[in-house]
Amino acid sequence: LHKEYRRQRQMCIRDSYSPVPEGVMDEGGLVLQKPEDLGEHRAITSAVNEAGGRIVLQILHAGRYAKVSTCVAPSAGKARINVFPPRALTTEEVWATVEGFANTSALAEQAGYVGVEIMGSEGYLINEFTAALTNQRDDEFGGDFDRRIRFPLEIVKAVRARVSPEFMVIYRISSIDLMDGGMTGEEVAEFARRVEAAGADMINTGIGWHESSVPTMAAPVPRAAWIDAIRNVKRAVGIPVMASNRINAPDVAEEIIASGAADLVSMARPLLADPEFARKTRENRADEINTCIACNQACLDRIFTDRVATCLVNPRAGREIEFDDSKTTAPKHFAVVGGGPAGMAFAIN
């Protein structure tokens, strides 16, 4: 299923692989730590490459968001969205985690990925180190701004040293934390400059923490609402910057790039809604795109309740093998009762 989903969407970032067991999202979560784990990864990268696409592996340590009793963080202090209180990492464990990111990156290259994305936003472990709110350490990884950002910079440097020059190192920065005690805009810009100096090839941008009370992706949030925060990062660096969050239409994406606010645009939910989004855009068929309505009901709501993500306007999402593109030899007529998103999506499909 994962292979078919990625094959259809081609250029993509495969998310949420932890470099160490305690960094998983939940019990039984995804970890890439050993060469013997590469078989399933090679199957996916081969499928994407054969379809003409490219795939990057996202390395994510969940930190205090990990729904496991062994969760860890820069400092003790429970997240509002997790029942488990974290244990503060020792200095030695911080360095071991840096090594874990480097090791997973090297394995990702062996598996056929063209790069890795280091997840440093949305309130996960790396983001927790950069914010005074969640970092009350008194060693070399906490205290003032320089020490709070040392952990991610050491990760970028270690990853860059472990992989080939052609292998992409993408850093996903929190362009705006939307949390009291988070980084200021000036700090974000300076941090981005140092991420570039540490060896990152590209910066992706995240918006807000998962526990923030500020909506970032719901339907009432205007399209490209956070572009000023992304532009702040773009102005600070010379490497490509990727925009994200509430960008679900080709004209919006093109306007962002044309304005110079970003060099490229990443989308997640719009590709759940329509895996042909990029092809339809390229072929000037934007009017045929099955647009994400930002309802979050079948994707994020399901993910955060430990269920498989799908899409309210695309019943094939997450069921690519069950509902393939083959045509029946005995077509039938159906009457669809109900004109809401689900009914219309069913009728179209």
Predicted regions, residues:
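Cysteine-cluster motifs in flexible loop/terminal segments that predominantly coordinate metals
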Residues: 281-331
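Alpha/beta enzyme core
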Residues: 10, 18-42, 46-242, 251-255, ...
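Short, flexible hinge/linker loops that cap or flank conserved catalytic cores
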Residues: 3-5, 235, 326-330
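Single conserved hydrophobic/aromatic residue that forms the stacking wall/gate
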Residues: 1-13
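Active-site proximal loops enriched in glycine and acidic residues that flank catalytic Cys/His/Asp
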Residues: 173-175, 207, 245-246, 266-269, ...
